[in-house]
């Protein structure tokens, strides 16, 4: 008799995705981040659901409802901090996952890659709106600054901003709609993640060498299930270390001050995972130019497959491209640091140079490095 997991309509899908899936035998720990992102998403949806049971999306009570969760709800504090720090873990995994894709040439799976970029944008939108919900000073002013960027769009900008706000400033209507969007988007992300997997399983996984591995596949279970479980345990360990020892390490102290439209904080800055994009935004003196650079800093990922000039897929055997990649990583770390600094000398010029370098590395230096390597290999 055939096994039920291979015949049952639902279990067959699970079986083909997580059990009998033919997987390259040599994928490294860099391939763990996909499953970790799935775990992060589930964790965020669950903790978010329990927070939503006690949260009120009204300007008068939002801040105190979060305080109430932390003080009066059973284990509310741990749920709240798991949700806040879970977002940070989510973005760490996201950046690692995208970096892995760039390094090993996984972007040649076009559909998978493009849905991944959409997933990244959707996650960034969700995180931004979630940051507004506690209605602290940084929540309010972050929302004001970022939504105001829409006013840079010619002709329709001002109307668009007021339409997003639901009034003439960030107020009750804005908070309510942000809560609604923040609640619905993770489910859209979950659906998109399934499509992401669907397209990936059409081609099969890439591997560190970038060479087709059809001749050398092993079943996903038990080999990679056990490997993923190790990754999940490490993820939860790091998350719980953050939550239980330094829950506010990655947050902003200003967000413990209730939102006050009459008092602007000295330094408005987003959460750490947006600082690189914020630095690019600030480094251009023109408003529309800054907004375009901000959008392009993420959308440039869509162009990466078309800028691939190498005859090899992975960077494993391409030392010049490896150098470029790690310079890009250093550049992004520099941008992240600059995004958290005040707008004054020398930070302004460092930010501008780092922003120029970011686009230059991806658009010019990496394709040129690949071409040089091709010539060195007499290809």
Curated annotation (Swiss-Prot):
Gene3D superfamilies xref list: Cytochrome Bc1 Complex, Chain C
Topology with respect to the bilayer: Multi-pass membrane protein
Gene Ontology CC, one term: mitochondrial inner membrane
Chain positions recorded as a ubiquinone binding sites: 201
A biological process from GO: mitochondrial electron transport, ubiquinol to cytochrome c
GO molecular function, one term: metal ion binding
Keyword set, alphabetical order: Electron transport, Heme, Iron, Membrane, Metal-binding, Mitochondrion, Mitochondrion inner membrane, Respiratory chain, Transmembrane, Transmembrane helix, Transport, Ubiquinone
Keyword Nucleotide-binding attached: no
Residue numbers binding heme b b566: 97, 196
Cofactor(s) needed for function: heme b
Manner of cofactor binding, per the entry note: Binds 2 heme b groups non-covalently.
UniProt keyword annotation of Mitochondrion present: yes
TM annotation in the entry: 33-53, 77-98, 113-133, 178-198, 226-246, 288-308, 320-340, 347-367
Annotated localization: Mitochondrion inner membrane
Residues at which heme b b562 binds: 83, 182
Alphabetized PANTHER family for the sequence: CYTOCHROME B
Family note: Belongs to the cytochrome b family.
Protein task: Component of the ubiquinol-cytochrome c reductase complex (complex III or cytochrome b-c1 complex) that is part of the mitochondrial respiratory chain. The b-c1 complex mediates electron transfer from ubiquinol to cytochrome c. Contributes to the generation of a proton gradient across the mitochondrial membrane that is then used for ATP synthesis.
Subunit (UniProt): The cytochrome bc1 complex contains 11 subunits: 3 respiratory subunits (MT-CYB, CYC1 and UQCRFS1), 2 core proteins (UQCRC1 and UQCRC2) and 6 low-molecular weight proteins (UQCRH/QCR6, UQCRB/QCR7, UQCRQ/QCR8, UQCR10/QCR9, UQCR11/QCR10 and a cleavage product of UQCRFS1). This cytochrome bc1 complex then forms a dimer.
Misc note: Heme 1 (or BL or b562) is low-potential and absorbs at about 562 nm, and heme 2 (or BH or b566) is high-potential and absorbs at about 566 nm.
UniProt protein name: Cytochrome b
Protein's gene: MT-CYB
């Amino acid at each position: 008799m055939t096994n039920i997991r291979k015949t049952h309509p639902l279990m067959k899908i699970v079986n083909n995705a997580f059990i009998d899936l033919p997987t390259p035998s040599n994928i490294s720990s860099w391939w763990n981040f996909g499953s970790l992102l799935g775990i992060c998403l589930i964790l965020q949806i669950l903790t978010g659901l329990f927070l939503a049971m006690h949260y009120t999306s009204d300007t008068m009570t939002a801040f105190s409802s979060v305080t109430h969760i932390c003080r009066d709800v059973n284990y509310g504090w741990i749920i709240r901090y798991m949700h806040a720090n879970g977002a940070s873990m989510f973005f760490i995994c996201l950046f690692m996952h995208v970096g892995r894709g760039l390094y090993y040439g996984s972007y040649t799976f076009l559909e998978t890659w493009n849905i991944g970029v959409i997933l990244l944008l959707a996650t960034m939108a969700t995180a931004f709106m979630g940051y507004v919900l506690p209605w602290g000073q940084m929540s309010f002013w972050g929302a004001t600054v970022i939504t105001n960027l829409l006013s840079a769009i010619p002709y329709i900008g001002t109307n668009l901003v007021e339409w997003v706000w639901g009034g003439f400033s960030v107020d009750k209507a804005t908070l309510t709609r942000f809560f609604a969007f923040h609640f619905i988007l993770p489910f859209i992300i979950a659906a998109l993640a399934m499509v992401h997997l669907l397209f990936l399983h059409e081609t099969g996984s890439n591997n560190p060498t970038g060479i087709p591995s059809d001749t050398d596949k092993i079943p996903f279970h038990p080999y990679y299930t056990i490997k993923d479980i190790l990754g999940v345990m490490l993820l939860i360990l790091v998350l719980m270390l953050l939550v239980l020892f330094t829950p506010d390490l990655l947050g902003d102290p200003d967000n413990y001050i209730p939102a006050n439209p009459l008092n602007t904080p000295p330094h408005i800055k987003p959460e750490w995972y947006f600082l690189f994009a914020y630095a690019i935004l600030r480094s251009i003196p023109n408003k529309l130019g800054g907004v375009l650079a901000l959008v392009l800093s993420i959308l440039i990922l869509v162009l990466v497959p078309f800028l691939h000039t190498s005859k090899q897929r992975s960077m494993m055997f391409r030392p010049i491209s490896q150098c470029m990649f790690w310079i890009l990583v250093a550049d992004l770390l520099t941008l992240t640091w600059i995004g958290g600094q005040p707008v004054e000398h020398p930070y302004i010029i460092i930010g501008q140079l780092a922003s120029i370098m970011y686009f230059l590395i991806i658009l010019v230096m990496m394709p040129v490095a690949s071409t040089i390597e091709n010539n060195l290999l007499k290809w």
